């Protein structure tokens, strides 16, 4: 027992930094920003005149997708089958030439309905609870909000509009800008 403790102390002293780097590189810790949702503008009867809807950026983390050879093909096939505007040659190019990149935006402002087939394919399980597609790796969705005006130009001079994301420029959007805006959150995991 004393010999084992002595050996562990020797390894820690001579190679501790090397092993610490290996352990830290294997950890799957991440932190994500949770975007705030700008408040709705409603009339006296509760009719929504301005609202924010969730949209998603499709993000490719090439370092995860290319970490094992068996992840590349299934991930690219899933992306091209679920998103018709994605090209497999472009995705293979990212895998080959940007394999260290952790953040490549593949598609901006996709609706929930557009990303749902991919999410279902990625999370599908069989009757025993085992993942059907365990090799789809390195794709995630970045949520943000887009301002919408259900009645278009109706009362637009009063309601106003936003620019540069969530900055009220005119009308109620500008007057109540501080009230309508929120603060981004953060999720750790």
Q: For the regions a protein language model found, what residue spans apply to each?
A:
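Periplasmic/cell-envelope proteins involved in peptidoglycan metabolism and beta-lactam response
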Residues: 1-189
């Amino acid at each position: 027992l004393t010999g084992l403790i002595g050996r562990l102390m020797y390894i820690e002293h001579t190679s501790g930094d090397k092993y610490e780097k290996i352990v830290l590189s294997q950890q799957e810790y991440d932190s994500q920003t949770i975007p705030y949702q700008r408040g709705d503008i409603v009339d006296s009867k509760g009719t929504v005149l301005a609202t924010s809807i969730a949209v998603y950026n499709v993000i490719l983390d090439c370092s995860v997708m290319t970490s094992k050879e068996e992840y590349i093909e299934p991930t690219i096939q899933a992306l091209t089958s679920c998103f018709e505007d994605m090209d497999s040659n472009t995705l293979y190019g990212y895998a080959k030439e940007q394999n260290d990149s952790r953040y490549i935006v593949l598609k901006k402002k996709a609706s929930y309905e557009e990303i749902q087939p991919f999410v279902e394919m990625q999370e599908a399980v069989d009757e025993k609870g085992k993942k059907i597609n365990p090799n789809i790796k390195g794709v995630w969705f970045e949520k943000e909000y887009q301002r919408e005006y259900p009645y278009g130009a109706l009362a637009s001079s009063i309601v106003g509009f936003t620019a540069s994301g969530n900055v009220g420029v005119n009308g109620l959007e500008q007057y109540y800008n501080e009230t309508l805006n929120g603060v981004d959150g953060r999720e750790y995991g």
